[in-house]
A protein has these predicted regions:
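Transmembrane helix-loop junctions and nearby membrane-interface residues
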Residues: 30-37, 104-108, 150, 175-179, ...
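Short glycine/serine- and small hydrophobic-enriched flexible loop segments
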Residues: 70-73, 149, 199, 203, ...
Length: 337
């Protein structure tokens, strides 16, 4: 009988592998000038490759789901809010500050004032920053997490509605009454619901909640329908809806991937786990490099493939260095307290 059941614990067990897949999707999405589609003469194949690249930002939504899931486990083990904030901020701030100093002050010459605005999340609301919005969002979600956790833990599935509906209403009000502000922050605030869904999945995972595997069929069907609708461009006339469409794409992807992944410790899974370990550092570094290193390359092939391979290798090297430095800083800060 157990063989006919899908256990939500599989999401937690597969979390690191899925994180690696999400990281690769983000790399693909930020490869806007990688012209591999030009290899093919078929317009259909070109369009499919372009569509796959452009929908790679679903990796961000997957990040948020897995983040919410992981936080549920972490907070359930230690619900001391002070300890929670300390752990979370020590995880994200050292690497973020290092990259922010390097890119903002040293490379861009934007000055210390802009660096402070970036660090205090103000650039998210003013529309000045298109690179650090994710980390601004994550810090905000960390601050709100204890409330989210309490609601989901107490009200279960009803808690999702209690949290998401007010957020959707607030988002809509901002869009109606201050469209400029909405355009600045929609990339972040429209993704809060998927983070909340991740918390709920964390609860179900920690409980070992099981469903009949047959339910995975309509989940796959939902995913297929949403991807098809996105591909044919049905949401182009209402662009603000697209962010929410990824809600209904990312959750099925996470569930189906956790079902497929067998955790057999094979070479592919180990590779994805290694990438997933550096997901934050890669996210911080890659987009900046891919935008700003192009002038360092004298020769470009017509597909820009050599350029992207070089940038990816450099990203992985710098991500490893950044993680080591930020971990050392975090360790010293913990010892000094």
């Amino acid at each position: 009988m157990e063989k006919t059941k899908y256990n939500f614990k599989q999401i937690s067990n597969s979390r690191n592998v899925i994180m690696g897949i999400a990281t690769i999707l983000i790399l693909i999405f930020h490869s806007q000038t990688l012209y591999l589609h030009k290899i093919f003469n078929s317009n259909i194949i070109q369009n499919l490759i372009t569509f796959f690249r452009d929908t790679g930002n679903v990796g961000v939504d997957i990040f948020l789901i897995l983040s919410g899931l992981g936080l549920y486990y972490s907070f359930s083990k230690d619900s001391n809010i002070k300890n929670f904030y300390k752990k979370r901020l020590l995880r994200i701030l050292p690497a973020t500050i290092i990259v922010a100093i390097f890119t903002t002050v040293l490379m861009e010459g934007s000055g210390f004032g802009y660096f402070l605005r970036r660090l205090t999340l103000l650039t998210l609301f003013t529309g000045e920053d298109v690179d650090f919005w994710y980390f601004s969002l994550i810090i905000i979600l960390y601050l709100l997490y204890p409330l989210f956790h309490k609601v989901i833990k107490k009200f279960d599935s009803k808690g999702i509605i209690m949290l998401i509906v007010p957020i959707l209403i607030i988002n809509h009000c901002i869009r109606v009454f201050d469209i400029t502000l909405y355009k600045n922050i929609e990339i972040a605030i429209t993704r809060i619901p998927v983070f909340i869904a991740g918390i709920y999945l964390g609860k179900k995972s920690s409980e070992g909640f099981k469903i009949d595997k047959k339910i995975l069929i309509p989940i796959l069907l939902l995913l297929s329908i949403m991807i098809l609708l996105l591909y044919i461009g049905i949401f182009k006339k209402c662009a603000f809806v697209i962010r929410y469409v990824y809600f209904f794409i990312s959750i099925p992807i996470v569930i189906l991937l956790s079902f497929i992944i067998k955790n057999n410790d094979n070479i592919v899974e180990r590779f994805l786990i290694d990438i997933g370990k550096y997901s934050m550092e890669i996210y911080l570094i890659y987009e900046y490099l891919v935008k700003n290193c192009v002038n360092l390359f004298v020769y470009h092939d017509k597909y820009n493939l050599a350029y992207y391979i070089a940038v990816i290798i450099l990203t992985f090297i710098l991500a490893h260095v950044l993680k080591q430095i930020s971990n050392n800083i975090s360790s010293k800060l913990v010892k000094n307290k």
